[in-house]
Amino acid sequence: MAEGEITTFAALTERFNLPLGNYKKPKLLYCSNGGHFLRILPDGTVDGTRDRSDQHIQLQLSAESAGEVYIKGTETGQYLAMDTEGLLYGSQTPNEECLFLERLEENHYNTYTSKKHAEKNWFVGLKKNGSCKRGPRTHYGQKAILFLPLPVSSD
């Protein structure tokens, strides 16, 4: 197989009834630490909730380039951002604080590092109680930084 080629297995997809990948659909970001879903509220507050029916947990991930994503709340229209203190907040407009480096880890969870603060290794993270973990308090290996993208519907 040449570099860059993609092979699809239509027969396997039909046989096992696997869903086709669609990155345009909203996702839920489920945090391994405490079982919370990342949420962006209308006032710009970012936290976690276990309530799967909360409309503010539906997030639209869009790629700026390979491995770089914007995370936007579909209900609020606000972008997830990290300020110079490492605090997460919702921004009305996309800016350099809203760009995150998405990485698929060996355990199949994703991590999101602030691109602006990439040299500091500041991750998006949630504490066990659902509150945000400041960037400087996060580091590789913590459960707080592990997120599993899930489909919105429970089907």
UniProtKB/Swiss-Prot annotation:
Q: Which GO-annotated molecular functions does the record name? A: fibroblast growth factor receptor binding; growth factor activity; heparin binding; Hsp70 protein binding; integrin binding; S100 protein binding
Q: Which InterPro entries match?
A: Fibroblast_GF_fam, IL1/FGF
Could you tell me which cysteines form disulfide bridges?
A: none
Q: Name one GO cellular component term.
A: cytosol
- Localization (cell): Secreted; Cytoplasm; Cytoplasm, Cell cortex; Cytoplasm, Cytosol
Q: How does it assemble?
A: Monomer. Homodimer. Interacts with FGFR1, FGFR2, FGFR3 and FGFR4. Affinity between fibroblast growth factors (FGFs) and their receptors is increased by heparan sulfate glycosaminoglycans that function as coreceptors. Found in a complex with FGFBP1, FGF1 and FGF2. Interacts with FGFBP1. Part of a Cu(2+)-dependent multiprotein aggregate containing FGF1, S100A13 and SYT1. Interacts with SYT1. Interacts with S100A13. Interacts with LRRC59. Interacts with CSNKA, CSNKB and FIBP. While binding with LRRC59, CSNKA and FIBP seem mutually exclusive, CSNKB and FIBP may cooperatively interact with FGF1.
This protein is called Fibroblast growth factor 1
